[in-house]
Amino acid sequence: MANNEQKRDEGYIEKLVQVNRVAKTVKGGRIFAFTALTVVGDGKGRVGFGRGKAREVPAAIQKAMEAARRNMIQVDLNGTTLQYPTKSAHGASKVYMQPASEGTGIIAGGAMRAVLEVAGVQNVLAKCYGSTNPVNVVYATFKGLKNMQAPEAVAAKRGKSVEEIL
């Protein structure tokens, strides 16, 4: 699993999570192609992921990066950590993420770590259960981050004060 990181002029951090060779069987044999899974973020709560497929690795990575920039979401962070513990699943992959105190760092594995790093989360405890397929882990992590809301937003929706919610 590659963990390549680049900073672009737009201020986005780009990470390559996975490159995979796939084959299409045709009458004359096999046609090989490559798929790429990437995550892109600004380190301040905006994060996106993308998948690309092409005959050559660089082209697949480029397509994945473009898809990731189009698929960005805003995550409500509590400083450098998450708002509250959260669980999420996609397919057979289940992820659990919980906020951590300052100085803890990112305690997460593989694909989940890449997503949290580019999102700007610096202190978190995370665990992946079930399938560790990077594609499903990234989807599950995104679901968890997307569904997380700041207490202020929840209070505003309910028409109550933050103190009443907490």
UniProtKB/Swiss-Prot annotation:
PROSITE patterns: RIBOSOMAL_S5 (PS00585), S5_DSRBD (PS50881). SUPFAM superfamilies: dsRNA-binding domain-like, Ribosomal protein S5 domain 2-like. GO terms for molecular function: rRNA binding; structural constituent of ribosome. Residues 12-75 form the S5 DRBM domain. Keywords: Acetylation, Ribonucleoprotein, Ribosomal protein, RNA-binding, rRNA-binding. It comes from the Bacteria. The modification N-acetylalanine is found at residue 2. One of its GO terms (biological process) is translation. Gene3D superfamilies: 3.30.160.20, 3.30.230.10. Coiled coil: none annotated. GO terms for cellular component: cytosolic small ribosomal subunit. Pfam families: Ribosomal_S5 (PF00333), Ribosomal_S5_C (PF03719). With S4 and S12 plays an important role in translational accuracy. Located at the back of the 30S subunit body where it stabilizes the conformation of the head with respect to the body. Part of the 30S ribosomal subunit. Contacts proteins S4 and S8. Belongs to the universal ribosomal protein uS5 family. The N-terminal domain interacts with the head of the 30S subunit; the C-terminal domain interacts with the body and contacts protein S4. The interaction surface between S4 and S5 is involved in control of translational fidelity. NCBIfam families: rpsE_bact. This is Small ribosomal subunit protein uS5. It comes from Pseudomonas aeruginosa (strain ATCC 15692 / DSM 22644 / CIP 104116 / JCM 14847 / LMG 12228 / 1C / PRS 101 / PAO1).
